């Protein structure tokens, strides 16, 4: 069952789909320096063996940094994933961060389960004008 929405401050952008946040309304043991995985999308990994996917991973991380640019965020649909990680919809300025990454072609849809194939992002990038 998801928890109620919570205001948060991003401490660090780990990669395109993981943030470290502080949630001031939570006790420090639960609310400081908490890794949050974005719900609804998956970005390439920074250590992917394919240099083209690594470049997309860096672009996704930089995109998230620019979109956030020290703005407060809201966490929605907060829950735990299969590895007990916190997974949430992250909204900044009223926009869903996962949706923005998907629209930018820097992420693929992901609802858990088997790791998605990020190579489709390469096809989309080369097909773009």
Where do the protein language model's features map onto the residues?
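Small beta-barrel nucleic-acid-binding modules, primarily SNase/OB-fold domains
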Residues: 1-129
